[in-house]
């Protein structure tokens, strides 16, 4: 089971009851944060989620509404007693931005490992439980979408283990992926494991125009979290001008990508009641929700 939470659903500037953009994934006690707008810490505090075990921070791009909460978050993590390194991934400019934070936080008890993304190529990073796929998207400055895959272990096959005459004392280690050599015999995980099982896929895209590449990138996601800067179809010209999306465009991506759920987020501060426009998305992709700050859902593995 994996927990997904929208910490903030606002774009451009915060308004009452709507923090700026941030999303967090929690799995097996470890956390991955995407974007860190103003109010990120407030939402985490209200939820009671521990900050200390945030291992990875991903940035889509470096507009202030996506990054302004970072200095305070790093200092709070420092005060939590964390000593393990934190990995931060983001577009070109990441190194300068984080180095600039040294003015505010000159000494941290943990190291920061920086991964700076250049150009428009696709990237992949594996950090702990999280397999992170990265796609360059269409915004006014370098911007990236992220897809987080959590793999599921293959199922133990008792009949297969017995058929292969694997000693009982080796079953546990083989199930964990270890190989064991005894005398001239090599025992491998394949001798006790059955078929592969589908994991979970959470995809996240804000500040982008639609594209065919994005559809393929988020294909078959269990949850697709996508910006819906404007709800009204009549504001499409504005979305095109500022390189954002309207609700119906996000819904088309969700439908074509055959995702399980679409969560809309990153609303314009002028969009006070996004729920009023939900039918613009639902008419295209039924399983759509309007994101709210601190909306949490547990996503279960399917057999």
Swiss-Prot record:
Reaction it catalyzes: Endonucleolytic cleavage of RNA, removing extra 3' nucleotides from tRNA precursor, generating 3' termini of tRNAs. A 3'-hydroxy group is left at the tRNA terminus and a 5'-phosphoryl group is left at the trailer molecule
Keywords, comma-separated and alphabetical: Endonuclease, Hydrolase, Metal-binding, Nuclease, tRNA processing, Zinc
Disulfide cysteine pairs (residue numbers): none
Pfam families found in the cross-reference section: Lactamase_B
Complex and partners: Homodimer.
Name this polypeptide is given: Ribonuclease Z
Gene name for this UniProt entry: rnz
Record keyword Zinc present: yes
Binding site for Zn(2+) 2: 65-66, 207, 266
GO molecular function, one term: 3'-tRNA processing endoribonuclease activity
Keyword tRNA processing carried by entry: yes
EC number(s) from the headed UniProt entry: 3.1.26.11
Residue ranges of coiled coil: none
Cofactor(s) demanded: Zn(2+)
Binding residues for Zn(2+) 1: 61, 63, 139, 207
Region forming the signal peptide: none
Record-stated family: Belongs to the RNase Z family.
Gene3D superfamilies the UniProt entry points to: Ribonuclease Z/Hydroxyacylglutathione hydrolase-like
Active site (UniProt): 65
Function: Zinc phosphodiesterase, which displays some tRNA 3'-processing endonuclease activity. Probably involved in tRNA maturation, by removing a 3'-trailer from precursor tRNA.
Cofactor note: Binds 2 Zn(2+) ions.
